[in-house]
């Protein structure tokens, strides 16, 4: 344990031991500025600060040994923050330190404000003096109370106030010097926060052009940050949300070659900036020495040779990597052995007998499959697959097995491309694919991947004449798969299929079921109804799509169609409110009317009582009818409206033989308004139009009208 750790440990728990060790520390031959800064900042916020303030002057000999620079100034400023003696020696040092500001117009006034003019009490004087000298129009400060970065708009040494416009406050704020000493931290004009607040457009342009320099600026001024924290500092404030992923990926690639930014071992660890720079080779050595895991060592070497190929121009660096790789004790015929061989061969120019064709040809199908499956570096995995294809007589079964089992999309793409190019392998794959279409649970991930490729026309497996039928088979299997995986660990595949099918207003479904037979569509509707991923609205749309293709489906279910009461959201809310009023208000009032009428006596001749009873009967009937209608109601949504033929939710333009045009909107009975030319779906004219397309004829008021245009009420 070094001095810093020991002193920090004793600070709170053993103060007396701390001061004894501090005396010893003061005689140290080697003085580290960064260590002193950390120690003094800890003391400043600790319970021993008052006691240490009496001996703070003991830091001065250590301070004098430090080289000139920001670190030395920081140490001295901290000494004056904790000192309580206000000695003559400290006063002279302070006056000498602030002499660099003597040309400032407010120099003498600042001396008075911080206590250096009379020299009686001057605690915190250097930090406060530096802040006062920084308080000029156009400079920036940071508010430690949550107001964020601010730009100085004006200063009055007479009133001892500063006017600051903060990013987190709507109006500029007048702040007294006394408050400023406690809350404000001066920022350089090139500080990350100052640049982000002062000229965000210029800083965004800079960050786009020089992403690594922008991140260096952030880490230098704000300290180490992990990826999430970097995102929080930059997204929207510098880089727009929609551009962030692309910008960050580009920045990460470039940062790998920046010697001044140390990349983290994991996503939770921070990026660290060091102006002196880090040695890439020393980073590699530290990574290798810090682990006994051969897999991690191979991964570290791969990252080094992949990202920092220029470092290998130095022969000593190349030999270092070769030595580290060859020193690994690896089992024969293992994925690790093959990965090492490929690194030595492809990146380091070393011969690797394990990769010779005759040796690969000796490996069995199971051995090759296990090796490929256990190679964790994708590019090496793909390279070894290419070797298997070139050298092994059993490459087809290895590729086929991998195609059926891998969950890596890029690997599946490569394997599929090679298999599809070979006639014999292609026939074998087709047999497997047809079996999978029949039973998608055999290879569910592969089925979902292949379904998307077939629909997009990127499979290359099936003849164009067979494609439509294959798509329909796969759609039916997809619905079956969605039903079966809904409550299993593979439910995400069901969600993926759902998103694929409902995207772009069910475009995939519409393309596949176009011109399908009525038998297929009946099965399609039935399978859809079993999928819990579909909402009731989705199921209504799917049924409507099927009915558009085969109108006979409508005629087959007249009762079901008749039972739906289409309504807009506003009308549905209005009717629900009406029902609540009938039940909760009018029925209660009617009950009181009946009770009052009873009190009049002689119910046989009591007309008030009879009227009240009749009103109750009417109310009960109205409540019954309205309740039944609400139960049948279905809110009309954008996805439920189709304009290839007239239906609910459509606006229809009719043209008479004389050229007169009239536009009708078709909605449910609750929304009907003849004055506004809004027809109920159940009206005679609407029923005459429903199911007809543009160009067809409608008989209206004894005259023929042609349908000129069909649009959605949302268009």
From Swiss-Prot:
The lineage of its organism: Bacteria, Pseudomonadati, Chlamydiota, Chlamydiia, Chlamydiales. This is Transcription elongation factor GreA. Keywords: Coiled coil, DNA-binding, Transcription, Transcription regulation. Residues 603-640 form a coiled coil. It comes from Chlamydia trachomatis serovar D (strain ATCC VR-885 / DSM 19411 / UW-3/Cx). Necessary for efficient RNA polymerase transcription elongation past template-encoded arresting sites. The arresting sites in DNA have the property of trapping a certain fraction of elongating RNA polymerases that pass through, resulting in locked ternary complexes. Cleavage of the nascent transcript by cleavage factors such as GreA or GreB allows the resumption of elongation from the new 3'terminus. GreA releases sequences of 2 to 3 nucleotides. PANTHER family: TRANSCRIPTION ELONGATION FACTOR GREA (PTHR30437:SF4). InterPro entries: GreA/GreB_C_sf (IPR036953), TF_GreA/GreB_CS (IPR018151), Tscrpt_elong_fac_GreA/B (IPR028624), Tscrpt_elong_fac_GreA/B_C (IPR001437), Tscrpt_elong_fac_GreA/B_fam (IPR023459), Tscrpt_elong_fac_GreA/B_N (IPR022691), Tscrpt_elong_fac_GreA/B_N_sf (IPR036805). GO terms for biological process: DNA-templated transcription elongation; regulation of DNA-templated transcription elongation. Residues 1-502 form the GRAD1 domain.
């Amino acid at each position: 344990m070094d001095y810093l750790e020991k002193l920090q440990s004793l600070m709170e728990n053993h103060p007396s031991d701390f001061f004894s060790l501090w005396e010893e520390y003061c005689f140290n031959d080697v003085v580290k500025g960064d260590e002193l800064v950390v120690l003094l900042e800890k003391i400043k916020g600790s319970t021993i600060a008052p006691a240490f303030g009496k001996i703070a002057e003991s830091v001065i000999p250590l301070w004098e040994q430090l080289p000139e620079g920001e670190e030395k100034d920081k140490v001295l400023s901290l000494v004056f923050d904790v000192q309580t003696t206000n000695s003559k020696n400290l006063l002279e040092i302070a006056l000498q330190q602030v002499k660099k500001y003597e040309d400032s117009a407010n120099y003498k006034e600042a001396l008075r404000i911080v206590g250096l003019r009379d020299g009686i009490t001057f605690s915190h004087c250097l930090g406060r003096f530096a802040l006062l000298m920084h308080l000029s129009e156009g400079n920036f400060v940071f508010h430690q109370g949550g107001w964020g970065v601010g730009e100085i708009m004006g200063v009055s040494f007479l009133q001892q106030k500063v006017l600051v416009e903060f990013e987190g406050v709507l109006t500029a704020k007048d702040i007294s010097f006394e408050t400023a000493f406690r809350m404000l931290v001066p920022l350089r004009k090139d500080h990350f926060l100052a640049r982000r607040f002062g000229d965000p457009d210029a800083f965004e342009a800079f960050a786009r052009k020089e992403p690594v320099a922008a991140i260096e600026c952030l880490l230098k001024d704000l300290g180490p940050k992990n990826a999430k924290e970097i995102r929080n500092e930059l997204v929207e404030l510098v880089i727009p949300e929609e551009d962030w992923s692309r910008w960050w990926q580009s920045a990460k690639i470039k940062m790998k070659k920046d010697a001044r930014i140390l990349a983290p071992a994991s996503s939770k660890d921070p990026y660290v900036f060091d102006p002196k720079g880090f040695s890439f080779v020393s980073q590699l050595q530290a990574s290798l020495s810090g682990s006994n895991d051969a897999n991690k060592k191979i991964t570290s070497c791969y990252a080094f040779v992949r990202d920092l190929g220029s470092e290998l121009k130095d022969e000593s660096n190349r030999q270092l990597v070769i030595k580290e790789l060859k020193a690994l004790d690896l089992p024969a015929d293992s994925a690790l052995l093959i990965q090492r061989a490929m690194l030595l061969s492809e990146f380091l120019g070393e011969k690797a007998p394990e990769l010779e064709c005759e040796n690969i040809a000796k490996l069995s199908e199971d051995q090759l499959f296990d090796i490929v499956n256990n190679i964790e570096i994708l590019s090496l995995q793909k390279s070894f697959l290419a070797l298997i294809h070139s050298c092994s007589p059993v490459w087809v079964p290895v590729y086929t097995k991998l195609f059926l089992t891998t969950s890596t999309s890029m690997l599946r793409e490569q394997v599929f491309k090679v298999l599809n190019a070979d006639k014999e392998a292609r026939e074998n794959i087709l047999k497997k694919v047809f079996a999978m279409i029949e039973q998608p649970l055999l290879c569910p991930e592969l089925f979902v991947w292949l379904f998307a490729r077939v629909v997009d026309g990127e499979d290359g497996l099936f003849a164009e004449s067979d494609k439509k039928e294959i798509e329909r088979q796969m759609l039916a299997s997809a619905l079956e798969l969605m039903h079966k995986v809904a409550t299993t660990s593979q439910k995400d595949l069901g969600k993926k299929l759902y998103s694929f099918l409902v995207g772009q207003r069910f475009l995939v479904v519409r393309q596949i079921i176009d011109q399908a037979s009525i038998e297929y569509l009946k099965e399609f509707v039935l399978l859809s109804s079993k999928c819990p991923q579909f909402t009731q609205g989705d199921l209504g749309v799917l049924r409507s799509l099927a009915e558009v293709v085969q109108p006979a489906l409508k005629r087959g279910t007249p009762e079901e169609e008749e039972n739906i009461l289409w309504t807009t959201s506003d009308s549905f809310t209005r009717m629900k409110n009406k029902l609540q009023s009938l039940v909760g208000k009018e029925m209660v009032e009617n009950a009181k009317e009946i009770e009052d009428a009873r009190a009049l006596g002689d119910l046989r001749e009591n007309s008030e009582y009879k009227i009240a009873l009749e009103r109750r009967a009417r109310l009960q009937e109205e409540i019954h009818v309205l309740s039944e209608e609400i139960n049948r109601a279905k809110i009309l949504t954008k996805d439920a409206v189709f304009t290839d033929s007239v239906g609910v939710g459509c606006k229809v333009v009719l043209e008479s033989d004389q050229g007169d045009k009239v536009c009708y909107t078709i909605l449910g009975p609750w929304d009907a308004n003849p004055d506004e030319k809004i027809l109920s779906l159940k009206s005679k004219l609407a029923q005459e139009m429903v199911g007809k397309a543009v160009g067809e004829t409608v008989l209206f008021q004894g005259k023929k009208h042609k349908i000129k245009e069909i649009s959605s009420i949302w268009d």
